[in-house]
Amino acid sequence: MYFKKLNIKIDIPDYEVGEKQLEYGINIDDKFNGLWYSDLKVNDQIDLIPEKYKSDFYLSFLEANSFILPHSDSGPTAVINFYIETNNCATQFYEIKNNAKPYQIKNQTDGCVYNLDDLIEAESFIAEPGDVYILDVSKVHSVIPLDNTEINRKAICFSTNSLSFNQVEMMFT
């Protein structure tokens, strides 16, 4: 399994986006295209993570403004994304073909990027604002715009480096 939609409803909390911590992408015509993570201060309590697991997660704010290349994440093994804005994009997961040639972009650590020719499409989903999904970000995935509207995706991310997707999923069963 690559992802799981949680059947929960959370009101969008009052939050403040802080300093940008990490970005992946390129500048085109003096505009950054890609995704970035920022510090996040949530002014309201979000009761999503069970108490005994809270220390396994860190909170950040994800923003993306373009197609996101197929990649596996650097760092986190699983994330819980609480989508704020989605802009009609699909999150597509892939299986890796034999003899694939992954590569890394600047500031990737253990994650990799893949060419589409090296991948086989697997499952996908289209998130709506307010949706909460668990993602196995150790698996290759991309974000694909489904129309030509401007992309301004936003999500509150609960990320873990210490728990697997299956362990996170079990927290909600």
Tell me what each language-model feature is.
Residues 53, 76, 150-152:
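A short, structural micro-pattern
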Residues 7, 61-66, 79-86, 137-139, ...:
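Short, flexible loop/turn elements at secondary-structure junctions
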Residues 49-50, 92-94, 167-170:
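Short, charged, solvent-exposed linker or helix-capping segments at domain edges/interfaces
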Residues 107-173:
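Catalytic core of Fe(II)/2-oxoglutarate
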Residues 1-43, 131, 149, 162-173:
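N-terminal auxiliary "cap/dimerization" subdomain that precedes the catalytic jelly-roll/cupin core
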Residues 33-59:
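A glycine-rich, hydrophobic loop/mini-helix early in the fold
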Residues 1-5, 77-79, 122, 155:
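Intrinsic-disorder/low-complexity, polar/charged segments enriched in Ser/Thr/Lys/Arg/Asp/Glu/Gln
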Residues 55, 62-132:
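Catalytic core of non-heme Fe(II) oxygenases with the double-stranded beta-helix
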